[in-house]
Amino acid sequence: IYCFDYLLNNLDWLETELGEYDNDYLVIDCPGQIELYTHFPVISRFVELMQQQFHFRVCATYLLDSHFIDDKAKYFAGVLSAMSAMINLDISHLNIMTKMDLVAQHEKNGLSYAQRREIERYMEPDPLLFADQDESLNNARFHALNQAVVQLIEDYSMVSFLPLDLSSEESINLIFSCIDNVMQFGEDEEPVEPKDLENEDANE
């Protein structure tokens, strides 16, 4: 919090460091402490500054490691954190499930159809994943809390994840394409006129 306050009080330095960018991606790796996005306004102020004073188009990307799907309680905690960040930042937002290449590496022959279908339930959070757990493993006190979490996710239906596999160029390009889309990148550019086919034929 102190670091962000210090940064926001030294905007001349920040402006110099940002320099002049033209059609570039500027990636700002923010701290992972969720309280910065849910309990304090420092990140929101920083985002507002980037948009209004420095005229950047901003897209927040929330990253959740794929190992979270091994623990459903941790996974749904991540879903709630993503939802909280989306609501509090109130900007274009994507949620990304990282390290999906490591998931496939656990299987020598790749993922089966059933395994792929199961993973899809985590890309579009399926509240019934909680119901799949063995209730004998859960403390009865948490049953009502689990049901409340499930109901909250169902009511908002805001969170979904894009899978990021660093070994797949297609996966990386999909992420870039989605970021461009939510930021409306390129919409201000002049359309490219098609070539004059008649003149082209005449020159052949």
Feature names for model-found ranges:
Residues 4, 36, 72:
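Flexible, glycine- and charge-enriched loops at secondary-structure boundaries
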Residues 4-6, 16, 25, 186, ...:
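Charge-biased, low-complexity intrinsically disordered regions
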Residues 15-33, 37-69, 81-95:
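Inter-motif core of Ras-like GTPase G domains
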Residues 1-11:
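Conserved nucleotide-sensing/catalytic segment adjacent to the nucleotide-binding pocket
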Residues 55, 59-204:
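Conserved GTP-binding G-domain of TRAFAC-class P-loop NTPases and closely related GTPase folds
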Residues 1-3, 32-34, 132-135:
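Acidic/glycine-enriched edge-of-secondary-structure segments
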